[in-house]
């Protein structure tokens, strides 16, 4: 894989002031000798000249030269800084491919090579991708902490604890005659296994909060027709996206939008009003409303506070313990007396008076902003959970009467699952899956 040379546009296919074309591999400098009218630079040098095709000038460029491992990729690399027109940039890329000394890179292949060349571990590689795709400040900070290795320390501590137990078991098996060896029976080992499980549970609990940071907080707006769901969505996303009408059943499909609060990304779903109806299309919309409730992290149940005979929708009964459910009383502007709602969240979507709702949401999710030291993406969470399962198997073996020499098999599996987070990956398909999510040219 690393014996060939790859190239790609690293700056995106848009008109811009400057574009970057990256070439990496053993033929990188040889390609430039063919297409560059200018001085072939030394490593870490920038040179100025023309890109040409058989002496036909194409663009005047700056070229950055990186020899060997003195760059991100860890192999001979050239970066061409060209004028950023889409056509101009693609003409240069086509010229590079025309030499037949390079092929077009796959998405994430430069980062994959950096990983395989030992320049970055798998955590840093994924952190780079997360930095690129960060939409809000909290996501950016989480990805940066991953890149700086702050999150890695939590996992490395678990790995060290497992290694210590494996080491003691191996000494017990191989050198039982040594006086200084701690005798590790099942009774002695079980408390250590239980402590490991507690450590895993704590890590998984914290890590699961990372999903809310990376994927956004899925927020479902539900309620009876004309309760003000669409009005609230439009206010939150600052856009007239949902249709507002006095006619019940106007919203037939789920309307989506995003908004940022306190640095956190919220993904909103405005659903069809829930009521009893014989209208087939409206029934389909209501079914979709219930589906959205199942997927949500935060459920905002919007209720028309001005209605004397309010429809009693027991939506809380349809929620799970891990979901957050809030009752929101709308249309405060129509109330003569608000005393009835003094302990409730009361808003007026019509007049954009929703400050108390925003403050309530901020207080609920404040813990996410404080959890800046440890975050994990979906791949890392999966590996931690697999590690925990292996530790559970070790515990089961010990409780079933088997000795440490059997439990060590599962401990080694747990160790491998955690080490995979940093790059001890034997499965090439897994690597391809991880890096294929990266941008072309990265």
Curated annotation (Swiss-Prot):
InterPro entries: G_TrmE, GTP-bd, GTP-bd_TrmE_N, GTPase_MnmE, MnmE_dom2, MnmE_helical, P-loop_NTPase, Small_GTP-bd
Annotated protein name in UniProt: tRNA modification GTPase MnmE
CC terms in the record's Gene Ontology section: cytosol
Xref: Gene3D superfamilies: P-loop containing nucleotide triphosphate hydrolases, Probable tRNA modification gtpase trme, domain 1, tRNA modification GTPase MnmE domain 2
Entry's family note: Belongs to the TRAFAC class TrmE-Era-EngA-EngB-Septin-like GTPase superfamily. TrmE GTPase family.
The TrmE-type G domain, residue ranges: 216-366
Enzyme type, top EC level: hydrolase
Main location as per UniProt: cytoplasm
Quaternary structure (record): Homodimer. Heterotetramer of two MnmE and two MnmG subunits.
Cofactor: how and how many bound: Binds 1 potassium ion per subunit.
Residue positions binding K(+): 226, 245, 247, 250
A Gene Ontology biological process term: tRNA wobble uridine modification
Binding residues for GTP: 226-231, 245-251, 270-273
Keyword field: Cytoplasm, GTP-binding, Hydrolase, Magnesium, Metal-binding, Nucleotide-binding, Potassium, tRNA processing
């Amino acid at each position: 894989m690393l014996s060939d040379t790859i190239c790609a546009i690293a700056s995106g296919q848009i008109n811009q002031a400057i574009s970057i074309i990256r070439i990496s591999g053993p033929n990188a400098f040889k390609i430039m000798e063919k297409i560059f009218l200018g001085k072939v630079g030394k490593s870490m040098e920038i040179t100025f000249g023309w890109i040409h095709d058989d002496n036909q000038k194409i663009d005047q460029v700056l070229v950055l030269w990186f020899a060997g491992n003195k760059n991100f990729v860890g192999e001979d690399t050239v970066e061409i800084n060209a004028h950023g027109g889409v056509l101009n940039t693609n003409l240069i890329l086509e010229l590079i491919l025309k030499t037949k000394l390079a092929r077009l890179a796959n998405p994430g292949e430069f980062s994959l090579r950096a990983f395989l060349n030992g320049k970055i571990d798998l955590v840093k590689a994924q952190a780079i991708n997360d930095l690129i795709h960060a939409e809000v400040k909290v996501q950016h900070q989480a990805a940066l902490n991953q890149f700086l290795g702050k999150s890695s320390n939590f996992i490395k501590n678990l790995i060290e604890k497992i290694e210590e137990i494996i080491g003691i078991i191996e000494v017990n098996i191989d050198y039982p005659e040594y006086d200084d060896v701690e005798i590790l029976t099942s009774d002695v080992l079980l408390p250590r296994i239980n402590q490991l499980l507690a450590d895993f549970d704590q890590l998984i609990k914290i890590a699961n909060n990372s999903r809310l940071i990376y994927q956004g907080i899925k927020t479902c707006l539900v309620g009876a027709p004309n309760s003000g769901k669409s009005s609230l969505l439009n206010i939150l996303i600052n856009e007239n996206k949902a249709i507002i009408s006095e006619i019940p059943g106007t919203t037939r499909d789920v309307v989506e939008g995003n908004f940022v609060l306190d640095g956190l990304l919220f993904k909103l779903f405005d659903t069809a009003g829930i009521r009893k109806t014989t209208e087939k299309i409206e029934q389909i919309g209501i079914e979709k409303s219930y589906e959205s409730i199942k997927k949500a992290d935060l459920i905002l149940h919007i209720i028309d506070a001005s209605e004397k005979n309010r429809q009693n929708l027991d939506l809380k009964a349809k929620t799970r313990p891990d979901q957050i459910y809030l009752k929101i009383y709308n249309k405060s502007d129509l109330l003569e007396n608000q005393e009835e709602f003094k302990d409730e969240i009361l808003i007026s979507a019509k007049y954009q008076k929703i400050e108390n709702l925003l403050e309530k949401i901020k207080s609920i999710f404040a813990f996410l902003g404080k959890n800046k030291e440890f975050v994990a993406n979906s791949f890392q969470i999966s590996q931690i959970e697999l590690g925990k399962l292996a530790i559970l198997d070790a515990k089961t073996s010990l409780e079933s009467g088997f000795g440490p020499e059997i439990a060590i098999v599962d401990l080694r599996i747990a160790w491998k699952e955690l080490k995979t987070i940093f790059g001890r990956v034997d499965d090439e398909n897994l690597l391809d899956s991880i890096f294929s999510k990266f941008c072309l040219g990265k």
